[in-house]
């Protein structure tokens, strides 16, 4: 991340398996989850599907907008997903350096 005023967040969205996919999609449409994504003050870094789990999303977030990301998830994702968030960072450059050091 080029700017120290930003943090990376990894968001885990686990599908609510008590609901059908149609029910989940209807809820997300009603709340505007996809329409309004990503939350204000954040930029999408990656979004992958973890099969039988849900989504793993990485966001670069302005440090003073972390609360707004949390509120976004509470207002738009709850009811369709269980939600967890973790501060994170890109380990790939470190792993590449370690690979060279351990060669």
Task: Briefly describe each language-model feature range.
Residues 73-75:
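Short, solvent-exposed amphipathic alpha-helical segments in soluble enzyme
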Residues 1-54, 61-67, 71, 89-103:
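Short S/T/G/P-rich N-terminal loop/turn motif that feeds into the first structured element of a domain
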Residues 77-90:
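Conserved short beta-strand edge segments in small beta-sheet-based binding/regulatory domains
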């Amino acid at each position: 991340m080029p700017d120290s005023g930003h943090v990376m967040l990894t968001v885990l969205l686990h599908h609510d398996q008590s609901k059908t996919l149609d029910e989940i999609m209807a809820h997300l449409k009603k709340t505007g989850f996809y329409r309004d994504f990503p939350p204000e003050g954040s930029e999408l870094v990656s979004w992958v599907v973890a099969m039988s789990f849900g989504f793993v999303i990485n966001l670069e977030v302005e440090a003073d907008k972390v609360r707004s990301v949390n509120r976004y998830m509470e207002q738009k994702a709850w009811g369709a997903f269980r939600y967890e968030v973790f501060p994170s960072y890109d380990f790939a450059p470190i792993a590449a350096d370690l690979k060279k050091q351990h060669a």
